Structure formats: structure tokens, C-alpha cells
Amino acid sequence: MSKLTSNGIALAAAAFATFLATDAMAQNASYTDLQATQGGAMYAADCARCHGAQLQGAEGPALKGAQFDGVWRGGPVKDLFAFIREFMPADKPNSLKDGDAAILTAFILKENGVPAGTQAMAVNPPGNIPAK
């Protein structure tokens, strides 16, 4: 194989790898309607006392609207997932299971207008919370 061909293949491979990495970062969060429904039930039972029944905030910060947008919009969904998993509930941090953090994240995303997808939210979910 000539040096020119070898360099061309290496360049094409590098460009393709960059495309894949960019595409993975650009994808939006994915969760199912079932996860959001389950998260809504858990939220009502365990989270609403601090964050309000409508996610409007009370003792804890609002999880919907401008306050949510300013903190989470455009960022990786895994950051929101990790925050919920590690710091909630405030009186028992790091007590949630991964599945609980996933359904709560799904519910919060749905309440903020992020549409459900066909893939269930995974642990350390890929993608971003879309900007408005």
C-alpha cells in the first residue's frame, strides 16, 4: 500500500471517528412514557413535599421552567441523572437505586417538554437535554 493511500485511509478513519463522537454528543435524551409515568408516581410520593406538586419549587428548587432551564438545558442528561442519584433525597443522599434515578429523570424531562422516545433511559444516559 502506498504512503498516500495509507495516509488517506487514516485521515478518513479519523474523520469518521470524529463524526461518531459528535453525533453521540448531539443526540437528545431518551426515555419511555412508562418510565415517565412511573417517575411521576414516585415523584408525588417522595419528592413533591420539597419540590412542589407541580415541580414549582418549595423547600427545594423548582424542577420545571426557567430555573430548570438555566441549570440543566443544553447539558448532558447524565449530569441530571447523576445529581438525582447521588444527592436526592436531601435527607438521605445516595440512597436511590439507578432505576429510581432513571424514572425520576424521565419524569422531570417530560414535565419540561422533552418528548419521550422509544429507548428506555439507561444508567449514565447518553445525550443532552435539548435547548428550547
Give the location of each predicted region.
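The canonical Cys-X-X-Cys-His
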Residues: 39, 43-53, 104, 108
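Cleavable N-terminal signal peptides
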Residues: 13-14, 24
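Electrostatic cytochrome c docking/interface patches
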Residues: 22-42, 92
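Gly/Gly-Pro-rich "capping" loops immediately C-terminal to redox-active cysteine motifs
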Residues: 36, 56-89
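Bacterial N-terminal signal peptides that target proteins for export
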Residues: 2-12
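Flexible coil segments in periplasmic/lumen-exposed cytochrome c-class electron-transfer proteins
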Residues: 91-132
